[in-house]
Swiss-Prot record:
A biological process term (GO) from this entry: thiamine diphosphate biosynthetic process
Native source organism of the sequence: Acidothermus cellulolyticus (strain ATCC 43068 / DSM 8971 / 11B)
One Gene Ontology cellular component: cytoplasm
Group of enzyme by EC: transferase
Gene3D superfamilies for the chain: Aldolase class I
Keyword Magnesium tagged: yes
Described purpose of this protein according to its UniProt entry: Condenses 4-methyl-5-(beta-hydroxyethyl)thiazole monophosphate (THZ-P) and 2-methyl-4-amino-5-hydroxymethyl pyrimidine pyrophosphate (HMP-PP) to form thiamine monophosphate (TMP).
Family annotation (HAMAP family): TMP_synthase (MF_00097)
Record CDD domains: TMP_TenI (cd00564)
NCBIfam families named among the record's database cross-references: thiE
Binding site for Mg(2+): 72, 91
Encoding gene per record: thiE
Binding annotation for 4-amino-2-methyl-5-(diphosphooxymethyl)pyrimidine: 39-43, 71, 110, 140
Protein name per its UniProtKB record: Thiamine-phosphate synthase
Amino acid sequence: MKASLADARLYLCVDSRRRQGDLPAFLDAVLGAGVDVVQLREKGLEAKEELRLLDVFAEACRRHGALLAVNDRADIAYAARSDVLHLGQDDLPVGIARSIVGDDVVIGLSTHSVEQVQAAVSDPAVDYFCVGPCWPTPTKPGRPAAGLDVVRYAAQAAGDRPWFAIGGINLQNLDEVLEAGARRVVVVRAIADAPDPAEAAAEFAARLAAAA
């Protein structure tokens, strides 16, 4: 699984698409277009409802050979048998999360500063990390942007550790992120809110592949 994560370039965070009512079709479209990792990110879900939705995500991931990620909760990741658990700075320590999910689950960590990147790189328990937000984003209201300088630092410091740039990334500013040294990105609205999500995902995937 860690090898699959290392090969991943395009990581999508998306909600349950309750408003659109198209979750299975949406997942098939974007995973078929080149999304490598997909994470359900929707605050306030009861555990039972989150697991029900994750079943839909898992089925789509199996069809397309993609990785399923769970946000924040090691217990949900364990119950859903996800491939990936992503933790924030204020979530469970990585070592405790590992004791819950086991050795086969890939664990990632959010970082927002040079110091946090340094800590992630020096911790062998962190399988990958995310760097950002590159720009202010409504997904994380009130969080100041880390900016591209932290992305540039990660590009120099990460070595062989996989990492993703995140936060406000879209097709218009993707080249700036690539020029800063990122070769993997996490995307939210630029795919989920696109007029044609599959077309947007395909363009992200193609441009990331060209930069690899």
